[in-house]
């Protein structure tokens, strides 16, 4: 009921407060290596540095290719995560599953727990077959998730099926994103990690609206959330098309050449 929701929200707040307190008390303050130029603000200096990083990217074509693949499939991942609760709670007549709030909360909590072990699994898999191949495997699973969400979850067993689907989401959710970041780290120059990761984050946020837009348009056109979910397979297919063409070894060689 309402008390369970209140406890859930309070526990999340205490979690963030606890780790924020550790940051405030334990993290050593470091002063800027370079002082802010005269007449500049932190905002203007940041945008100039972002532009400089963008111009430098021409020296790393494989990294750019990887970023394109990442932006595509990550938009799909983020949108699935964002709309899954809406899809699960919506009534069957709208193409949803019709889950009760208590059941939905239980699935969400289960996903957070299983995702931890999923991240460990993908870390081991990446050591075995490589980071890029691990991401490709995860994208096939993500594609399978949206296909099953579209075609399944309709009968009397839909609650149990959604729990099982949640396990698959949890397994690939943390792992695919963590491996993506670690692979990007191998494709950028040493000593410029902050610059390139800033570009990585800004570019990611700049395209994050496309997934919800596609989902919403498909839902409006076809009148069912299931078509909205199915439309997200575009991002995973696009990622699967681009990612195999990324030459990780050449990207690392480019980094050595321009470091």
List each model region and its residues:
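Helix-to-loop junctions at the C-terminal end of transmembrane segments
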Residues: 117-131, 219
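A membrane-interface helix-boundary motif in multi-pass transporters
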Residues: 1-14, 217-236
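Juxtamembrane intracellular "pre-TM" segments in multi-pass secondary transporters
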Residues: 28-67, 94
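Multi-pass alpha-helical transporter architecture, strongest
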Residues: 15-26, 230-259
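C-terminal ends and interior cores of transmembrane alpha-helices
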Residues: 140-156
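Hydrophobic core of transmembrane alpha-helices in multi-pass small-molecule transporters
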Residues: 158-175
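Loop-to-transmembrane helix entry/capping segments in MFS-fold secondary transporters
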Residues: 101-102, 190-200
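Short amphipathic helix-loop junctions that connect adjacent transmembrane helices
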Residues: 82-103
């Amino acid at each position: 009921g309402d008390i369970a929701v209140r406890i859930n929200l309070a526990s999340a707040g205490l979690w963030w407060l606890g780790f924020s307190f550790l940051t405030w008390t334990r993290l050593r303050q470091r002063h800027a290596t370079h002082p802010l130029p005269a007449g500049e603000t932190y905002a203007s200096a940041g945008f100039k540095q972002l532009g400089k990083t963008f111009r430098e990217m021409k020296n790393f074509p494989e990294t750019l290719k990887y970023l394109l693949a990442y932006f595509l499939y990550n938009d799909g991942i983020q949108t699935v995560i964002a709309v899954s609760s809406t899809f699960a709670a919506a009534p069957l007549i709208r193409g949803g599953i019709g889950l009760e709030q208590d059941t939905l909360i239980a699935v969400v909590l289960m996903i957070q727990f299983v995702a931890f072990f999923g991240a460990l699994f993908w870390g081991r898999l990446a050591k075995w077959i490589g980071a890029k191949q691990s991401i490709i495997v995860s994208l096939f699973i993500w594609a399978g998730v949206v296909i099953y969400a579209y075609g399944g979850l309709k009968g009397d067993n839909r609650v149990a099926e959604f729990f099982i689907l949640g396990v698959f989401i949890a397994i690939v959710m943390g792992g695919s994103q963590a491996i993506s970041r670690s692979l990007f780290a191998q494709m950028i120059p040493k000593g410029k990690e902050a610059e390139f990761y800033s570009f990585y984050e800004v570019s990611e946020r700049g395209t994050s609206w496309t997934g919800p837009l596609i989902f919403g348009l498909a839902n409006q056109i076809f009148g069912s959330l299931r078509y909205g979910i199915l439309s997200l397979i575009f991002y995973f297919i696009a990622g699967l098309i681009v990612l195999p063409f990324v030459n990780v070894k050449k990207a690392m060689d480019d980094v050595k050449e321009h470091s």
